[in-house]
From Swiss-Prot:
This is Periplasmic pectate lyase. It is found in: Periplasm. Residues 1-23 form the signal peptide. InterPro entries: Pectate_lyase_2. Pathway: Glycan metabolism; pectin degradation; 2-dehydro-3-deoxy-D-gluconate from pectin: step 2/5. GO terms for biological process: pectin catabolic process. Its main location: periplasm. GO terms for molecular function: pectate lyase activity. It is an enzyme of class 4 (lyase). One of its GO terms (cellular component) is periplasmic space. It comes from Yersinia pseudotuberculosis serotype I (strain IP32953). It catalyses: Eliminative cleavage of (1->4)-alpha-D-galacturonan to give oligosaccharides with 4-deoxy-alpha-D-galact-4-enuronosyl groups at their non-reducing ends. Belongs to the polysaccharide lyase 2 family.
């Protein structure tokens, strides 16, 4: 009897194994469940005998189970476990329990959160995670690249605070308060920085005085939006869960700092609301340290005048932060906060409209590289070395991708402006999704045989469906989902190519599949909204030749194919 049961169990497991290229034959929820089971099997702590921690490695080789390591310049190795880079996975695990009825995934996610609060929260409230801190899964000790001074940093990470508050609201509150306390250097002028100091004593926080400064005032701290986004998001969630009015005031105040300097004519910008304080004279254009002043002014100022500032540079990468990551986050906060979020909605939608009006070229579905005043930099040759490239480099228009399709589709649900729809329509067509119509459901011809396998496209199509209830958009999303499973579900993990050495446990493909399944089951609230957030690890990394590779990012490790090694990046 036992033998028969064992054989039956093995046959069931065999049925659940889905070879690449055949995965569409099985339902999506089973695929996501199998994926998460594989993560828990291969990325878990196997180093501590019968008392393992609940923590997970960030990356794993699906073929061998080898967990991805960080190699420090002195040769030390650490199995990378950066909780800030696992927040999409936490949302997947929670959503999977909601849809499947199996509580084990939610429980594991809760255990991971609880373990971090119990073991990796310092006395200031900060967690050992982010751009320059992580846990070595082998030793369970906090690690970090020494040349980065082991500072705290979150940039577009958007932690799953809903889960964190449900596990330990007091510890989550301590973190958010500590986060702001460490990253606001001067509350009077709201000088912020992406780097925060661990162990900093708590200051006056929300009780601090504030004096509004003129646009682009000079500070030592760099007010990058990708760092500001996480501050805005965290304080807004503190208000949502704890009704902390001071947190809301400062969250909206910080968000407003990125709105006030927008160009008066175009409404574009800004990526920073300050400019770097010049503390030394540069001797080399190629040395782009912020102590020499605003990097855009140094490189573009002689030709374009005082408006050429870092905050005003509407270039590839910066615009993704502005009009995708920031937009998605603030659109969601606008919903979550009710009437208190109306300002955030207006600021966000107005910004997307401005970018559509001045930046979008529907003829070839590209965005123009620009200065916020509308100065088109398309095909501009850089006259000198600098922060934005070497002398002789040419700035080119860049494709409007699915990350923008999501934000424009979601914004259309808030404001049915044809300008927003025009951008969404152009991107969808260029991405091989067909014609989504002159308006929702009108004159459309979606491509139900599309080969698109981009999870961003799937999320965007669900947003189009949610905004319009036009069934064809969700049918198209199902086709994209099938393509994702056929082309990206490899050896039980999601990877862009079967040649990749490591799979990222924070992959968004299962997140997108789960969101679709929730929609089809009429349970959209079962899966957390997608905000396009992601954590990262950055620091010096030991090369095969014994040299130290400066400013190495974990995503570069995830891009390596089997047998490849990191190549020099030329950074000093």
């Amino acid at each position: 009897m036992k033998k028969r049961a064992l054989l039956l169990s093995m046959s069931v497991l065999a049925m659940l194994y889905i070879p690449a290229g055949q995965a569409a034959e099985i339902d999506r929820l089973t695929v996501v469940k199998q994926y998460v089971d594989n993560v828990l099997n291969k990325a878990s702590d196997t180093y501590h005998g019968d008392k393992p921690s609940p923590l997970l490695a960030d990356g794993v080789d699906p073929r061998t189970g080898q967990q991805m390591e960080w190699i420090f310049p002195d040769g030390r190795r650490a199995v990378l476990s950066n909780f800030s880079a696992q927040q999409n996975l936490m949302r997947v695990m929670s959503g999977l329990s909601e849809l499947s009825g199996d509580p084990q995934y939610q429980k594991r996610a809760e255990d991971i959160v609880r373990y971090h609060f119990q073991n990796y929260q310092d006395n200031s409230g900060l967690l050992y995670w982010g751009g320059h801190r992580f846990v070595d899964l082998k030793t369970l000790q906090p690690e970090g690249p020494s040349e980065k001074e082991k500072v705290h940093e979150l940039k577009n990470a958007y932690p799953y605070y809903d889960l964190m508050f449900s596990v330990d609201s007091d510890a989550t509150t301590r973190f958010i308060r500590g986060f702001w306390n460490a990253h606001v250097y001067d509350w009077r002028i709201l000088e912020t920085s992406r780097h925060g100091e661990y162990g900093k004593p708590m200051g006056a926080l929300w009780e601090s005085t504030f004096e509004q400064q003129p646009p682009f005032f000079a500070t030592k701290g760099l007010s990058f939006l990708n760092a500001g986004n996480d501050l805005i998001y965290s304080a807004s969630l503190l208000y949502k869960y704890q009704q902390d009015q001071g947190a809301l005031v400062w969250a909206k105040r910080l968000a407003d700092q990125y709105v006030l300097p927008r160009d008066a004519k175009t409404g574009l910008g800004v990526y920073q609301f300050t400019q770097a304080l010049k503390r030394e004279e540069p001797t080399d254009d190629a040395d782009t340290h912020s102590k020499f002043g605003d990097r855009a002014q140094r490189q573009f100022g002689p030709e374009f005048g005082p408006t050429a500032l870092e905050g005003n540079m509407m270039l590839k990468g910066r615009t993704s932060t502005l009009y995708s990551e920031n937009a998605l986050m603030q659109l969601q906060l606008g919903k979550d906060l009710g009437g208190q979020g109306d300002d955030l909605l207006k600021w966000t939608v107005d910004g997307l409209k401005a970018f559509a009006k001045y930046g979008y070229n529907e003829q070839d579905n590209t965005f123009r590289p620009m200065i916020a005043n509308g100065q088109d930099l398309s095909n501009y040759t850089l006259p000198r070395d600098g922060y934005y490239g070497k002398k002789g480099s040419v700035l080119k228009p860049y494709k409007a991708g699915n990350e923008f399709l999501i934000s424009y589709a979601r914004a259309y649900a808030v404001d049915n402006d044809p300008l927003l729809w025009k951008v969404a329509r152009g991107i969808a067509s260029d991405q091989g999704l067909g014609d989504i119509g002159s308006a929702p459901g009108k004159e459309m011809k979606v491509k139900l045989d599309t080969t698109n396998s981009d999870p961003y496209a799937l999320f965007a199509l669900l947003d189009l469906y949610n905004a319009s209830q036009v069934a064809e958009y969700r049918s198209l999303a199902e086709k994209v989902a099938d393509n994702i499973i056929k082309t990206r579900y490899i050896d039980g993990f999601f990877m862009a190519s079967p040649d990749r050495q490591y799979a990222d446990v924070d992959a968004i493909e299962p997140y997108a599949l789960l969101a679709l399944e929730a929609s089809l089951r009429n349970k959209p609230q079962a899966v957390a909204p997608f905000l396009n957030g992601a954590g990262f690890t950055e620091g010096a990394y030991l090369m095969a030749d014994g040299s130290a590779r400066i400013s190495t990012r974990d995503n570069e490790l995830f891009l390596l194919n089997v047998g490849e090694t990191l190549q020099p990046n030329g950074r000093k």
